[in-house]
Amino acid sequence: METDNKYARPVYIPYSGTVLLEMSLLNKGSAFSEEERTHLNLHGLVPQTIETIEEQAERVYSQYRLLKADIDKHVYLRNLQDTNETLFYHLVVNHLTEMMPIIYTPVVGEACEHFSEIYRASRGLFISYPNKDRIDEMLRNVTKQKVKVIVVTDGERILGLGDQGIGGMGIPIGKLSLYTACGGISPAYTLPVVLDVGTNNQALLNDPLYMGWRQPRITGKEYEDFVDAFVQAVKRRWPDVLLQFEDFAQKNASPILKRYRDEICSFNDDIQGTAAVTVGCLIAASRANGGRLRDQRVVFLGAGSAGCGIAEQIIAEMKHEGLSDEQARQRVFMVDRFGLLTDKMPNLLEFQSPLVQKTETLAGWEVTNDEISLLDTVRNAKPTILIGVSAQPGLFTEEVIRTMQSHCEHPIVMPLSNPTSRVEATPADILRWTDGKALVATGSPFMPVHMNDQIYPIAQCNNSYIFPGIGLGVLACGARRVTDSMLMAASSALADCSPLAQNGKGALLPELSQIEKVSRTIAFAVAKAAQADEVAVKVSDEELLSLIDKNYWYPKYRSYKHASS
């Protein structure tokens, strides 16, 4: 197999001695062979015993398990990542279910809040507004020559925690860790970026340890021009890169995506990735209930960019299954803090307007006041699906859930808000209120629920099921853009991997232990869709599978030879 041959071949490097040991992408620590220690000037710089990566992993895992607090575990793993990336990924891949919540949600939220306190070593690129005229220079300072995936944030809407300034860098770092651990994209090809445009978080501005630009956030044309300067510089440095926008505030997220999605290969994971994984989960849940997505009625709590992005993707899938645009939109109801979105509601955002309900269609509804509440909407719309993206805990009350089940025996309930402290309802409560009949998926990880002598596995509707496969597919086929069809293909491929939909039992989504298979399946579907949309060169299925193999990186040590030898 080509992959095996690749790892058997030596890599010629110009580094040696302490310089080599300080390079996390190349460092092997105690695993350097006798020959490598001689030719790379490492004798005396590492302990005498030569270890395998498995022996090293046993040691670091033992150290990891001694730590009690999740944030301490996060800091430990980040330090390992900055020291020896191959060992880090070997450890994470072999303990993915245990460690994903530590390196990403929910613990990454706490790491972002305390970023300046726990900061130890530089990773990624910090592009601050005062240096707006030096962006090309800063990109040239990146030592990685073949960057293929960038995740960028401005730190304004970090999970459900709001403005974290440059602390938002924790999100691109964590996200790219999952591109590698779940999608096999080499860490040598990834770059996390934070656009430091100031912060409106007064606690950070007052914090003497805060490491970002201590000014209120720039806005308007200043902000737009700065983002554009970054994107244009990226296009000059790495014109074929996949650029993922992450955790931008809703007032900026949709406009940025709309502006650049046809200019550079890019997508917004909060809008499109969240939508794709949610739709995949909903297709599977609909199949498990004996129907299709086009048959469902959907109520959202939360009408921001993420919620509206999911809604639009649901509508696209309903249309794909045969409904007209009008029919599909009549089946989706958006509720925000001011109530149900209607055509009479003032001050709607641009992306909300297509999702309003016409007032005349609500004439027969029985409501408690002028603002149509979530409970009013559930009572009158009679949804089969309830989705929470509000970041407001506890709003899926017992009354709401029981009202929903009164007209739908097996309601599909998805409290997707992150982190766990922001979830609209816990799976245990939802299952208790529905006597175990609800199908539940969450945004943050939850343990299985034990009730009535049964165990209910809880699917985590996590974007990590989608974006690594999208990235792998884009890299494998060389896609020039990320199209809507590619995202729909990802959703459909994910649904095909659902144990519950396929076998009638288990969780809505496969276990994380199956993530490589899932990512490869999604990558193939995404690449085929890219070819159909003519944004990638058409090749045979066999060649495409070979390209996916070629692009899939495993955390294995390579043997080194000095470039001068």
UniProtKB/Swiss-Prot annotation:
Catalytic residues in the record: 104 (proton donor), 175 (proton acceptor)
Superkingdom assignment: Bacteria
One GO-annotated biological process of the protein: malate metabolic process
Gene Ontology molecular-function annotations: malate dehydrogenase (decarboxylating) (NAD+) activity; metal ion binding; NAD binding; oxaloacetate decarboxylase activity
Annotated TM spans: none
Positions bearing the site annotation: Important for activity: 270
Catalytic activity: (S)-malate + NAD(+) = pyruvate + CO2 + NADH; oxaloacetate + H(+) = pyruvate + CO2
A UniProt-annotated Pfam family: malic
Co-factor binding comment: Divalent metal cations. Prefers magnesium or manganese.
Family: Belongs to the malic enzymes family.
Subunit structure comment from the entry: Homotetramer.
Name the record gives this protein: NAD-dependent malic enzyme
Lineage per the UniProt record: Bacteria, Pseudomonadati, Bdellovibrionota, Bdellovibrionia, Bdellovibrionales
